Amino acid sequence: MCDMGGLDNLVANTAYLKAQGGDDKEMKKRRRSLSLPKPEQCASLRTSLDKDFESLCEKQPIGKKLFRQYLSQGGPECTTAAEFLDDLNEWELSESAARDKARTNIINKFCKEGSKSSLTFLTGDVATKCKAVSDKDFEEVMGQVKTATKEFLKGKPFTEYQASPFFDKFLQWKEYEKQPISEKYFYEFRTLGKGGFGEVCAVQVKNTGQMYACKKLCKKRLKKKHGEKMALLEKKILERVNSLFIVSLAYAYDTKTHLCLVMSLMNGGDLKYHIYNIGEKGIEMDRIIYYTAQIATGILHLHDMDIVYRDMKPENVLLDSQGQCRLSDLGLAVEIAVGKTISQKAGTGAYMAPEILNETPYRTSVDWWALGCSIYEMVAGYTPFKGPDAKKEKVEKEEVQRRILNEEPKFEHKNFDAATIDIIKQFLKKKIDERLGCKNDDPRKHEWFKSINFARLEAGLIDPPWVPKPNVVYAKDTGDIAEFSEIKGIEFDAKDDKFFKEFSTGAVSIAWQQEMIDTGLFDELSDPNRKESSGGSDDDKKSGTCTLL
């Protein structure tokens, strides 16, 4: 007898895996009909755009790329400034002999009197220090020179860039970025999982081939459970974050029935899956250290923006196809004003810090406690306050809470070593002012991380210790994912429509621009020799915008 559930799962997985391989023929056909808006359509945008140097020339990928193209043609000082920043960045990311070589190269190329590439735009004390720099004070002096170089670029070069064809091209891309987004913009594939308000499925952008995960929140379910505020807060936080170690939001839109968040596709499974479903329980130590380094960096990025994660646990740490991990599910994250605290109870029981259970004031301390619990679980295959027999004998929630408040974790598993025990103990200090990460300290400086070069890690230059197999779907079978019951008796009003509109803002600049670059569409549409196809609707031709669907 045919197992239809198994067949459905096979079909879903096959289509999903095939989509990740791409269809170049279909993609080329679609792209021939695309074109950027005409320059004259960008006049209002030129006036309204915030002329912030850091945003336009450093953070936004297309803006950064076009500003660098301008600098390469903007005269000797502009060219030299760009070369210096590139060479200094190379030095910052180098190690050992390569770092020494890069330092010597910078001194000889930019600091020696009479050099063709001397930094002539430097003035005063910084110029004097640059010319006299030595190996001993190199790092300190170059920090000052870097700041002065950026100040130079923010002046006349930035002003002249805004009057150049390169900035005109940037405005065309910004106008294109504003295109309306709907479900017709994507192909939809298998369901990856379900949560309290909806499901997560794999999607693919039709025009670029980029794969994403789409979190579809049921509008009626949100309204019934009063989840609108939480959904909007998660969306706004995701828009703000820009870290390799936190899932990126690329698009936000709505359909008749759902609010949709389109985010990084993390198809390597979550860490909980890797702890409990692959081989022996637990994860190898080199992987644990690597993942924790990325997690800690992601948490610090949130804390720098006064955002507390509040749901740190292995289940919320996802791996991508390259084996890099990111924090996900920011539904419980909250922004806390500087100097303020909260005492709200939130999180997952086994990872809750004492201050959450006691409902006493807290800020970022709760994330470091939860990270300590997560490291323990990755090593041992069980959480520190449930113990190894939790599966055989269910430990009641009240008992777990009692242990968190009154007991110290036991380190009986054979894979615990001295450094690992120490960092876990430091994270699981019951008093906040004694806890690692809560004493104006950086947890990444603990000896446990001695094998990690964090500058290179943040630049994405360290190869992961484990890479997912490309032909494996690290997600539950579609038949194992429970269906939702129908929501009846829920109607929408003007207030709901206003909320949906506030949520549905389309493309998110940084992630969208990176997609355009990574998939080659930026180079293709920016090619001055490219011949535009006659494809597209009459409305497209009249407006000069691209054919979207």
Swiss-Prot record:
Residues found modified as Cysteine methyl ester: 546
EC category: transferase
Bilayer topology term: Lipid-anchor
Domain Protein kinase: 186-449
Sequence positions that bind ATP: 192-200, 215
MF-aspect GO terms: ATP binding; photoreceptor activity; rhodopsin kinase activity
Function text: Retina-specific kinase involved in the shutoff of the photoresponse and adaptation to changing light conditions via cone opsin phosphorylation, including rhodopsin (RHO).
Domain named RGS: residues: 53-171
Transmembrane segments: none
The species this protein was found in: Danio rerio
Main location: membrane
Similarity annotation: Belongs to the protein kinase superfamily. AGC Ser/Thr protein kinase family. GPRK subfamily.
Remarks, miscellaneous: Although the protein is present in a diversity of vertebrates ranging from bony fish to mammals, the mouse and rat orthologous proteins do not exist.
Effects seen without this gene: Impaired cone response recovery and delayed dark adaptation.
EC number(s) from the headed UniProt entry: 2.7.11.14
Compartments it resides in: Membrane
Modification(s) after translation: Phosphorylation at Ser-33 is regulated by light and activated by cAMP.
Protein name according to UniProt: Rhodopsin kinase grk7a
Residue spans of biased composition, Basic and acidic residues class: 527-543
PTM-bearing positions, type Phosphoserine: 33
Assigned GO CC terms: cytoplasm; membrane
Residue segments, region Disordered: 522-549
Gene behind this protein: grk7a
Lipid tethering residues (S-geranylgeranyl cysteine): 546
Catalytic residues as annotated in Swiss-Prot or TrEMBL: 311
